[in-house]
Regions:
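Glycine/charge-rich catalytic "coupling/switch" loops of P-loop NTPases
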Residues: 233, 261-263, 267-315, 339-356
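Conserved coupling/switch loops of ABC nucleotide-binding domains, chiefly the family-specific signature
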Residues: 58-61, 219, 251
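The feature captures the beta-strand-to-loop junction immediately N-terminal to the Walker
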Residues: 37-39
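Helix-to-loop junction immediately C-terminal to a conserved catalytic motif
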Residues: 52
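ABC ATPase nucleotide-binding domains
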Residues: 84-86, 90, 94-242
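Conserved ABC transporter NBD signature motif
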Residues: 60-72
Length: 356
């Protein structure tokens, strides 16, 4: 439904130019929810702005619903107002001099061909019912809470029944509790409408919870994409592992590798562990073993197959505790149930659930 091929964008700078996008390729099928996730400056918002028609790419092409809306080689650049999209900005961009009805109705009033007044009213009220704001149609925008303004912004983006919905960090201005609530509401809204969605965020929780596909961006490129569980559980590199939650890294050398399983001798002679691997590895190759804090099982008595560590720090977090453990020269993080009670300086034994 949305197809992007070879997208590039360079901004002029005093020292010659900054390449914000370095060949972006991806597709979103009809009804899909695709998230661009990354730190500030990675290129995610530039990609969305190119799709919206707010930026003109230097290279590559963009198609929405089979229609080419940007093609640098052919000189095609369809203006934003002629693209079949809905857009929600980070700031919501609710017009303060209008009431809720007028805010949502505006896209219909300026579109061509014009709609009859009765049709506009019906479409606006339908959109407001979708977001639970039908009783606020006559409320002034300045008298809305942050969550209500966000709902109005969603209604305005959907009122034209666009082929593609673009969301530019729409939850980032909300407090933590409201952000979590709105995350569920947004999922339900998109599920009910079936609209194809491109979502931009730096928040890994939003990306993992809502997306069909997550694409992690860094340095103007997509460094890994896939289903949320796959990208989180099987990161391709340190960049992805570090950005998506907490990650532990252990250096080692491959002892043996076959049938998707590698035996790795950890540096410092601490131990040998067995880990899954999608790469073709040769004995003697240096590797990073990457695993999550929740993949570490911790106990206070030695058991066959466990690895001895020293507890460096314990941080109580309510339902769980986080341990910082020293294994040789490496520091590891582990999520531990409060029933396991240790203090800094104690010995502990761990099992790494690398097969997960």
């Amino acid at each position: 439904m949305l197809t992007i091929r070879g997208l590039t964008k360079t901004y002029a700078t005093p020292d010659g130019g900054f390449q914000a996008l370095k060949g972006i390729d991806f597709e979103i099928p009809q009804g899909g929810f695709y998230t661009l996730l990354g730190e500030s400056g990675c290129g995610k918002s530039t990609t969305l702005r190119c799709v919206a028609g707010l930026e003109e790419p230097d290279g590559g092409s963009i198609s929405i619903g089979g229609e080419v809306v940007a093609d640098a080689e052919r000189g095609v650049q369809v203006p934003a107002f002629d693209r079949d999209i809905g857009l929600v900005f980070q700031s919501y961009a609710i017009w303060p001099h209008m009431d809720v009805f007028a805010n949502v109705a505006y896209p219909l009033r300026v579109q061509r061909p014009r709609l009859a007044a009765a049709d506009i009213k019906a479409r606006v009220m339908e959109a407001l019912r979708l977001v639970g704001m039908e009783d606020f149609a006559n409320r002034q925008a300045t008298k809305l809470s942050g969550g209500q303004q966000q709902r109005v912004a969603f209604a305005r983006a959907l009122v034209r029944r666009p082929k593609l919905l673009l969301l530019d960090e729409p939850l980032s201005n909300l407090d933590a509790k409201l952000r979590e609530q709105m995350r569920f509401e947004l999922q339900e809204l998109i599920s009910r409408t079936g609209v194809t969605t491109l979502y931009v965020t730096h928040d890994q929780s939003e990306a993992l919870a809502m997306s069909d596909t997550v694409a992690v961006m860094a340095g103007g490129r997509i460094v890994q994409s896939g289903a949320p569980r796959e990208v989180y559980g099987r990161p391709d590199n340190r960049t992805v592992a570090n950005f998506l939650g907490s990650a532990n890294f252990l250096r080692g050398k491959v002892v043996d590798a076959r049938d998707g399983l590698a035996t790795v001798a950890l540096d410092g002679g601490a131990t040998t562990i067995h880990v899954p691997s999608r790469a073709t590895l040769s004995p003697g190759a240096s590797v990073d073993v990457i695993f999550r804090p929740e993949d570490v099982t911790t106990c206070l008595e030695p058991v066959d197959g466990t690895i001895e560590c020293i507890v460096e720090r314990v941080v109580f977090q309510g339902g769980m505790s986080e341990y910082q453990l020293r294994l040789g020269s490496a520091l590891l993080r582990a999520v531990v149930h409060p029933s396991v009670s240790a203090q800094a300086g104690d010995r502990a034994w761990i099992t790494i659930q690398a097969e997960r």
